[in-house]
Amino acid sequence: MPRPIRTLAAAAAALLLATACNSASTGGTSEKPGSSDSSVRGVTADAIKVGGIVSMTTASGYSKKDTDLGARARYDRANAEGGINGRRIDYLGAEDDGQDPARNLAAARKLVQQDKVFAVSPMSSVTFAGADFLDGQKVPTVGWGTLPSFCGPRHIYGFNGCLVPTPGGTLNQTWPEGLAAVLGGARGKSVALIAGDNDAGKFGIRTFTQGFKAAGFQVSYAKAVVPATSMPSDWSAYTKEILRSGPGGGAPDAVVSVMQTPYNIGLFTALKRSGYKGLLSDPTDYDPGLLAKDATKQALDGVHVLLQFQPFEADSPAMRQFKADIRKAAGGKDVPLNMHMMTGYMSADLFLSIAEKAGKDLTVESFQKAADGFSDTGTLVGDRAEPKGQKESFGCGALVRLTNGRYEVAVPFRCYPPIPFG
């Protein structure tokens, strides 16, 4: 279905930011592009070779492994429908970068230089050390655009656009405007923003501070201070400062975390134990699998989670197709849906949509030409357009709230006007 680095993806989806990389050499097109002996890397007369890079394992236990399942589900359907302009997708699966920059770059090099892929889709990690390599080797790459590397490089695309703007670009206002709706307006409301102590977290704090202020909030606390490589065992130093940051030394109306799930569980548990009754929000904890443990369910109860795609609770034709594709790829089982599946699925979908438009003679050049004029509407991430998506997000999203062990839509999926970033 045609249709945009992860400490920031905790920051800009809402964004857990990350970095990635690339590699390999692109052959010329001296042979006829559609022939079986075509010199286009990863393209034969009947197949297009694609690989992925995903943080399947991490030191904290957090995993994005279902990103691979989501991508496979979409590629499987494309193949079942006859492929792309007569070519099947030969999806090699995702390389595990372990959320490690060196492994991310190594994965990119392997896929390009050893496996000879035409494209990398999905790429989902909080690190994208392979980005320069992939772009330099002209490898079309699609993933979750929560890292700066998804904003500007010619051959790299975010499945829902660029979520990490550069000066002169724009900011997605889905999160602040959505929370303003939940709180009955932003006027007179205060918000605390917290992120990990790394470049991605610092950039996330910068962007969200501007965004929440533009929406009318008072930003009472905005710090990227949590150790990014080791989760705190004691959150009191952070909670005490947050709970005294509001007007008059009181608690803020909302606490927004731009961190990954294990960190959010620790922070939110500590805030609740301290008696905090305000709104809690993050961009990563939309995952029914998290609810299997009572402690996790309690920590996340009441939390508003930012989504940049239609909620699974939606009953649109596109969502019904997504669920059917995931079920089939999972062997006919009704597996719990999560945002990583959507990341993989829509990364694959954007790649397929552009490749379809490129036509039978698929080369890097024809793919890029197709991308330069690509647009579609009504997808699971809203209306898509390139190269616009390499400079700004598609601007759409929703908020869901965990209530008594179930997710419910708090703010329906819609698109918001962006604001200038500077």
Where are these regions (language model features)?
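Extracytoplasmic "Venus flytrap"
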Residues: 33-72, 94-101, 196-203, 336-342
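Extracellular/periplasmic ligand-binding modules, especially the Venus flytrap/periplasmic-binding
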Residues: 197-200, 205-207, 261-266, 311-373
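Extracellular/periplasmic periplasmic-binding protein-like sensory domains
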Residues: 161-165, 270-345, 414-418
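Solvent-exposed, acidic/polar segments of extracytosolic/periplasmic ligand-binding ectodomains
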Residues: 31-37, 48, 375-422
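Bacterial signal peptide processing site
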Residues: 22-25
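Extracellular/periplasmic Venus flytrap/periplasmic-binding protein
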Residues: 102, 157-274
